Amino acid sequence: MQTAKKIVGIDVGKDWLDVCLPDGRKEHIRNTRSCRTKLIKKAAKLGAIVCFEATGPYEEPLADECLARSVKAVRLDAWGTRKFAESQGRLEKTDAIDCEMIRDYAASLKDEKLHFIKPRSEAQKRLKKSVRTRKNLLKARAIIANQFEDDLDPETARHLRSALNSLDKNIAKVEAECDAAIASDERLRELDRRFREVKGVGPCLSRIVLAQCPDIGDFNSKSIAKMCGNAPINHESCTIKYKAKPRRGRSDLKKALYMAAVSASRNNHILREFYQRLVANGKPRKVALTAVSRRIAILINTIAKHPDFKPAQDPKASAKAGGAKRGRPRKVK
């Protein structure tokens, strides 16, 4: 029988924290270091689990404070919290309601469904910040690049090109920072090397996996596929059966895996044959690419889980490397 858990639900904002304590009392405090410290000390005295939603960079200081004081913390999925609130008839959405729903949703989950935040190394923290910065710079570059038109006047075009050149330099610097963060940590460096031994997996996918999935290797095949958003999800109702389609998943990881699948379907001998077999059997090309991206996600997770695991190599390349020549066997007299 599941025992009742003490939960502190927190709705995190840029400037404010809305808190719902285990006894139902609510607080509205500033999102500053001193206020966060007082709040986590209070949670530690209560022996409570601190729960909050993923909000980009704003919940990171709160998570670090929990880890520093050995307080268990859980980062919940905002989609699940919202669906839980609607199931309780709470259609309104305010910060005060959100912190209460976060507390109630976490309390309703089984103990094994609460995935506690694990401490990150300094290299992992730097890598995560650099990957996020690179993403924002690429977004800014795309906005400026899309402003070029055929009838653009020369002066405006000059300003836009100057901005693009500046962004390109900054993107290169941030990518160098990502590589430096990986090189400074032995575990990250080894995983990066092993990931990139797989044809189709490049530096972009490797950085995103190491930055956004510090617990890579702890999943089974179904869990990693669902987390990456490339697992087919069944949708049935009585006699109606819809096509199983991937749903949700981590957006950045999903995009990076898809582009890796495009590369692997051309350059990776094993995955290319898998892709071509699916297309030959009538699967649409995008569905086949999604299946390839799922294979890559499972392969990366297996590499991280088993230090001695080595993915299968291209048999043609292996034969060349070993100097073996295939031909008809000689008859022995």
For each predicted feature, which ranges?
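Short low-complexity, flexible loop/linker segments enriched in glycine and/or proline
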Residues: Q88-E92, R248-R250, T302
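Short helix-capping/linker segments at secondary-structure and domain boundaries
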Residues: L109-L114, I144, P214-D218, A264-I270, ...
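Helix-hairpin-helix/helix-loop-helix acidic hairpins
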Residues: F148-C204, C213, N268
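Amphipathic alpha-helical interaction segments
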Residues: M101, H159-S162, S166, I208, ...
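Low-complexity, acidic/Ser/Thr- and charged residue-rich accessory regions of DNA metabolism proteins
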Residues: C238-T239, K243, F274-K333
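Phosphate- and other anionic-substrate recognition elements at nucleic-acid/protein interfaces
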Residues: M1-R158, N165-D168
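Phosphate-backbone recognition surface of nucleic-acid-processing proteins
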Residues: H28-I29, S34, P203, R207-N281, ...
